[in-house]
Amino acid sequence: MNRRRWWRSSERRWRGLVSLFLSVLSGFLTALSMPGFLSGALIWFSLIPLLYAVEGRGVWKRAFLSFVYFFTHVLISFFWVLPTLTENVPLVFGRYPSWLGIVVFVLMGIIEAVPFLGFGFLSYFAPQSIVLKTLYLASVYTIFEYLRGVGELGFTGGRISEALYSHTGLIQIVSITGTLGLVFLIVSLNVLFYEFLRRRKGLLIFPVIFFVYLLNSSVVHLLPVPERGSFKVVALQPNVPTSLKYSVSSGEMLELLESMTKDFHGSIVITPEAFFLEDVRYSQKLRELSEENTFVIGFPADNQNSVFVLEGGRFRKVYSKVKLFPFVEKLPYPRVFGVFSFLKGLSYYEPGRNFSVFNVGESPPLSVQICFESYFPEVSRAFVKNGSELLIVVTNDGWFHYKAALLNHFVQGVFRAVETRRQFLQVANTGITGLVDEYGRIVDALPLRVRLAGEFHIKARKGETFYVRYGDWFFYLSVILAVVSVFISRMRGERNEGIGIRL
């Protein structure tokens, strides 16, 4: 009897270790599908190990395994944040030791993964029929992916839809559904492929994948040929390393601005975020430069992270950042997270009050968002609803050493462009500075980590897409589909996947 009990206990431990390994494997494969890693095609299969891991498990084990999956995905996908937290920020601001950056990095992974406890928990109630199960699990995953981006700590980075940024045909659906539609599609195919394998019909995977890529290719060939726009701007990529940026004086940056624009006359010149680190509205030299060119220039002022237009010697503030970055630009929930105030950047800022659209000379109505605001689709939506005919983001990505970090940020513009059918220009300190057209095609980009001033010709567009008009309606559809799937399953007398399994 004791031997039998020992055997059963060993079997449970072994199965638990296998399930844990499969969850980690899912996170690893999902990370490898992200921009700058191995291949976006991995996303069609990356959730299959997780689905095997949770099969036959109780609700709490499912919740834990789902958490482990997304925690692994975040730590690998955002590995480039670690040297920023352990090297760059302590070096520049000197507020904490490097080892504490590791703690913060792990806590970031925990915060991002917490919503997926809910996915694992609710996966217990999945119907057994293949169609209802696919609809249910895809809907539940989509629900928690949306919730992860909501609130003071909300962030959309690492969304599995990012793996498809180069699948130009498939991503056209985001003009209707937003990226949540892609999330739903990805999870649906993973569940479908898992069921094929479980039922020993794995060969059916190949025609489905063939159809997906045939559809992608067909849509690409139907898209209009890229056109050169009539609105010309000059984007500056000053390539000032973080190790120098916070020690260089405004006078030196002014000299750099002058040298980079000396060959341009009568142009609209756009600088990255915080080109100057102090309010320079009283600089006579800068005003003199504006007699030659018009500047869209970023610097902090009035306790806000702002963008100004300098035209004919006159400054006007055109936008202040609304979505401030947690812990660096604002302290969310101070009573809870007050201990993390050491992560503060230059200052805690006041958020801007509106998503303002403006003109520069004879330009079409345009808008400028700042840094990681491009991760949030509601920002671009708000600008377009306010009349913006093209989208610009200015950023300082010099904090990050790795190309994967720069690409991850840049591809957010691919999705924002398709969602809104607006051309999207990113202007970055070290790169990537480039232009994406309204169909998500990367039209032009400057070389990374090279000091350059590049001319970009942008095409303005009017009108509102379905997504701009109705926003994240797909979230509500996912809620309805999840409820209806369970309801139909109960009406048919089906048992859910977890019935008979211990909690």
UniProtKB/Swiss-Prot annotation:
What does UniProt give as GO cellular component? plasma membrane
Q: Which InterPro entries match?
A: Apolipo_AcylTrfase (IPR004563), C-N_Hydrolase (IPR003010), C-N_Hydrolase_sf (IPR036526), LNT_N (IPR045378)
Name where it mostly resides. membrane
Q: By which gene is this protein encoded?
A: lnt
- GO molecular-function annotation terms? N-acyltransferase activity
Origin species, per record, is Thermotoga maritima (strain ATCC 43589 / DSM 3109 / JCM 10099 / NBRC 100826 / MSB8)
Q: Which GO terms describe its biological process?
A: lipoprotein biosynthetic process
Its biological function? Catalyzes the phospholipid dependent N-acylation of the N-terminal cysteine of apolipoprotein, the last step in lipoprotein maturation.
Where does the UniProt annotation locate this protein? Cell inner membrane
Q: What name has this protein been given in UniProt?
A: Apolipoprotein N-acyltransferase
Q: Which domain of life is it from?
A: Bacteria
**Which pathway does the UniProt entry assign to this protein?**
Protein modification; lipoprotein biosynthesis (N-acyl transfer)
Q: How is it placed in the membrane, per its record? A: Multi-pass membrane protein
- Catalytic residues at 273, 321, 371
The CN hydrolase domain covers which part of the protein?
Answer: 231-460
List the PROSITE patterns hit by this protein, alphabetically. CN_HYDROLASE (PS50263)
Q: Which residues cross the membrane?
A: 13-32, 34-54, 63-83, 102-122, 124-144, 173-193, 203-223, 468-488
What keywords are annotated for this sequence in UniProt? Acyltransferase, Cell inner membrane, Cell membrane, Membrane, Transferase, Transmembrane, Transmembrane helix
Q: Which Pfam families match?
A: CN_hydrolase (PF00795), LNT_N (PF20154)
Family in the record: Belongs to the CN hydrolase family. Apolipoprotein N-acyltransferase subfamily.
> Organism classification, top ranks?
Bacteria, Thermotogati, Thermotogota, Thermotogae, Thermotogales
